[in-house]
């Protein structure tokens, strides 16, 4: 199987990859359901999580078609996104979250905990290990319980259904140059800007002038001030 880095940076290639991922997700959901029916709950849980990951990968690849694929930094970040289990899981929930924003507001903490549980439960559902608290060996069948496995299989099926609807009815978002730059920006650099009070003074002035695009504000601030060692407040005071 080709490694992700060997994918051609073209919309056609990413479209084909997205279609393959969603088909594989459907197969994984079917297989997870069969395992649950035969009470192989640990393996059912593992395959259900894998199905959610593949669903998320399909969505990442779909949205990637609207980015500047000729930019090496953007494409490198895309490879990182569809190769990361956590990002895949988060992306798998995006269609359902987008259609029920009120539920997101009410259940934000529960949703965050659910995504974390899926990320953390993946490996214990497949591999034996030594518990860190008492140094005892544990089997996946001892860790994953029936309710958790069946719930995870249903969740995988729901994510798949929502993703199929999204992929059928939408076109890839067309991202601006600033949005692509923000997407490719290292997380440490982004968080440094977000934690800089001077940026927020800049952002408030931009918003008051009717320029409320977050990506454009971040990139503009970094180019005009942060990267050249200047302060917005000092320059405008």
PLM segments and residue spans:
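Terminal alpha-helical segments
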Residues: 1-237
